[in-house]
């Protein structure tokens, strides 16, 4: 972030006990809070115990059937920890705006998925999208979902790192341009740190329905591209 003309917020906060956001970009009037998902929420002992309880509560029901209450209750288990993350980020952006008098600035939460790998990308994004749609986050104008692990796409022969932005107002061209530029700089930085990529592409839209987290050398789904 600092290599993209951003600066740390913390040194600018004078009062003690303020839970501030991480970065600010003065030229674009943007505040960014970075959240890293380090826990695999679906694999914690507490979650697994609750899953067993729900399955026992709904005997014989297919947990993958979207029409069944069991499916909705299972997804709710994963939604709750993600909602806590988004709630915290929104509050930190709000506190930063208030402390520094940046009331007309835009707020962005960058959600980096490092450890939550048991859920496919479309499920994580679906949960995040549902959270943002069902709750008022007046200080979060955009959310960027980024992966620190590789993702397999049926229509791509490569393992991919995702940078997937969503907006509360997609007609805010200035914010969209800023996010796109930040994404390009992130790709350049990643290529410098990790080595050159085989391909670096941008899409107006991305179908993640059959995307999956790369866990080994073999593909999970057949490559369907040209």
Predicted features, each with a name:
Residues 1-14, 26, 45-50:
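Acidic-basic catalytic patches of nuclease active cores, encompassing PD-(D/E)XK
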Residues 14-15, 37:
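Short, solvent-exposed coil/turn elements at secondary-structure transition points
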Residues 19:
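Beta-rich catalytic cores
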Residues 23-25, 30-36:
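Conserved catalytic cores of phosphodiester-cleaving nucleases, focusing on short active-site segments
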Residues 37-175, 194-226:
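Metal-dependent nuclease catalytic core centered on acidic motifs
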Residues 171-175, 179-190:
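Terminal interaction module
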């Amino acid at each position: 972030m600092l290599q993209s003309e951003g600066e740390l917020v913390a040194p600018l906060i004078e009062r003690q006990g303020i839970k501030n956001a991480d970065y600010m970009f003065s030229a674009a009037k943007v505040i960014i809070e970075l959240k890293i998902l380090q826990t695999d929420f679906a694999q914690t002992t507490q979650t697994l115990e609750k899953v067993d309880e729900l399955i026992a509560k709904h005997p014989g029901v297919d947990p993958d059937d979207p029409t069944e209450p069991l499916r909705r209750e299972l997804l709710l288990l994963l939604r709750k920890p993600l909602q806590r993350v988004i709630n915290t980020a929104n509050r930190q952006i709000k506190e930063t705006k208030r402390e520094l008098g940046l009331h007309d600035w835009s707020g962005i939460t960058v959600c980096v998925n490092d450890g939550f790998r048991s859920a496919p990308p479309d499920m994580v994004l679906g949960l995040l999208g549902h959270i943002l749609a069902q709750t008022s986050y007046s200080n979060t104008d955009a959310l960027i979902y980024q992966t620190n692990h590789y993702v397999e796409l049926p229509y791509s022969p490569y393992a991919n790192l995702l940078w997937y932005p969503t907006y509360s107002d997609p007609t805010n061209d200035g914010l969209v341009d800023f996010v796109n530029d930040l994404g390009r700089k992130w790709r350049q930085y990643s290529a410098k740190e990790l080595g050159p990529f085989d391909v670096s592409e941008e899409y107006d839209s991305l179908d993640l329905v059959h995307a999956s987290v790369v866990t080994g050398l073999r593909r999970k789904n057949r490559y369907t591209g040209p």
